[in-house]
Amino acid sequence: MKLRFADQTFSFELLRAASYGLSGGSEIGEVLATAKQIQEGDFDSWHRAWHDTASRIEALAEHSLHQKHCLSAGQAYLRASNYYRAAEFFLAPDDPRRNTTSEGSRTTFWKFLEASGLCVERVRITYEGTTLPGYLYRVDDSEMPRPTLLSVGGFDSTGEEL
């Protein structure tokens, strides 16, 4: 299996999913197995393949958590989150699957944070009369003031991806 499609956008998004392996957000075998299920240029098959993979890995995470294997559960939740994000990518803005798929990505990411034991807090950032969701990552659970970096993605990224 080659890690590309004739369609450059499909290839880019496939490589994007594979690149998360560097931080534990994907496994190359899962990415290749998913890509094998995708029909060239077919957005529905893209969504279906990634959504099926995300659901399977989320179930694996749930099983690991039930067995008290928190590290394995957290790793699987992180991969599921990224696979749900990949599943959502090509959906039209008015596609009813978009909201549930995006919610799957966020929910599994939150479960990853819980299982991982990282010092992360979900926050709301005040901006121009509204608030924006965000995450505050701390090096430890002390209240010691430290420099803060605000990272913002583009239109096609998610807060969980950063």
What are these regions (language model features)?
Residues 138, 144-154:
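Short beta-strand element of the alpha/beta-hydrolase
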Residues 16-86:
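Long amphipathic alpha-helical segments
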Residues 135, 147, 162:
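Short acidic, glycine/serine/threonine-rich loops at helix termini
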Residues 155-162:
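The serine-hydrolase catalytic nucleophile loop
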Residues 48-50, 54-57, 100-143:
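N-terminal cap/lid segment of alpha/beta-hydrolase-fold proteins
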Residues 67-69, 141-144:
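Short, glycine- and charge-enriched coil/turn segments that flank and shape catalytic ligand pockets
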Residues 1-20:
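Charged, amphipathic alpha-helical segments characteristic of ABC-type P-loop ATPases involved
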Residues 16-33, 82-123:
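An N-terminal hydrophobic leader/cap segment in hydrolases
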